[in-house]
């Protein structure tokens, strides 16, 4: 079959989801462990950018979204890194509640995570920064993220300047760069099904009889 016509009616483009199902009995009681299971399956399936997630923030007037990479997660939350002067970081400073979305299209799955984002410790940021390749560490110093620049030549000149400055290979962690941790208050796991009768399960925190936090799991209508 040839490539679709650029004039094709996009309303007619559809795919019938039938790869898998999701039942309540299949779910781990801990949403972080359920996420780990699905992420491992996404990695095993060799999906392109399986750790990519859409981060949505709010500046008080309008939302904005962008793709960032998950770099760590545990029961405390989900970590990504950015320039603290970026639009996303400024949004978070004023309105910390955000959402994350992992769209694993080839598995007909997605996971949405909601909760407040908070800065991680400098020690945690340093540990990750030190693990990055030289060029990636240098790039942090080159770009004033989200600022208007007149041309790409500005970046090339700044790169040359930073390359000379850190020619010995020792690139320090700048004060303006580091990580955020999204502390989850809600999860939704979505599995595509035939006829758009998709499986959706939501996790929300609750306390058990011993006042320990557990998670309530609810099936949602598609």
From Swiss-Prot:
> From which domain of life does this come?
Bacteria
According to its UniProt record, what is one Pfam family this protein matches? PNPOx_N
According to UniProt, the reaction catalysed is:
pyridoxamine 5'-phosphate + O2 + H2O = pyridoxal 5'-phosphate + H2O2 + NH4(+); pyridoxine 5'-phosphate + O2 = pyridoxal 5'-phosphate + H2O2
Question: What GO MF annotations does this protein's record show?
Answer: FMN binding; pyridoxamine phosphate oxidase activity
Keyword Flavoprotein appears in the UniProt entry? yes
- Cofactors demanded by this protein: FMN
Quaternary structure and partners: Homodimer.
- What family is this protein classified in? Belongs to the pyridoxamine 5'-phosphate oxidase family.
The protein's name: Pyridoxine/pyridoxamine 5'-phosphate oxidase
Q: Which organism is it from?
A: Prochlorococcus marinus (strain MIT 9303)
In the record, what lineage is assigned to the organism producing the protein? Bacteria, Bacillati, Cyanobacteriota, Cyanophyceae, Synechococcales
